[in-house]
Amino acid sequence: NARRKQSGTLIFWFKEWLDLTDNHDNAQLLMHTDPKDPHGQDLHKIINTLRLDTNRQVLLSTTKITPQHLAAMYGMVDCTINISDAEGFGLATLESLSCGTPIIVNMTGGLQEQITDGLDWFGIPLYPSSKAIIGSQDVPYIYEDRLDKKQFFSAMDKMMALGKEGRKEMGLKGRDHVMKNYNFTNFNAVWIENLLNLHEKGGSWDTRNYNQGIRFKEVA
């Protein structure tokens, strides 16, 4: 429920999509998060304000659960959504694909690598409509990839139009993608290979050469 996760935005947009498609009795948004996260929004307040608690249109999962129960949760939903405006990788969507459940994601960060292998798609992509540059004293600048809600509505419609079998086929392709490209055998091999290459090219601490070309000047 951090600000960049856009949890409040997702709830507002989900409510609008329910209104547009008359699906208040047929669709449910399940969020596994902390609704009182000090770095996020008060999700209880948003849900109550939008009256999304009347038919339990939005459910919150707030306690830690076992991997088996988490896998069951992914298995019982139609898709997993991530509309974060910045995402390093996105563990939840990787978990979703590994359980055979397709995803709807913002095309930012590592999410771009998860949703497609360059040939097949394992969900519905959302392309940023604008980019903002934000920052702080510690982080001078970072990009925010912002979405248009109409594109979100369209993605939801497309996902539902696939039907149960279409979503299953897409999700199983995504699972194959995860098993092939994110397994621990490959991870261990690539990790060791990268460290050896770094040592070979950059040297050890006493013989390091990555700072060549950098000039240090005294500032009065």
State where each predicted segment sits.
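Conserved donor-binding/catalytic loop of nucleotide-activated donor transferases
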Residues: 75-77, 95-107, 117-119
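C-terminal amphipathic helix plus adjacent low-complexity
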Residues: 139-145, 149-220
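Short glycine/serine-rich donor-binding loops of glycosyltransferases
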Residues: 90-93, 111
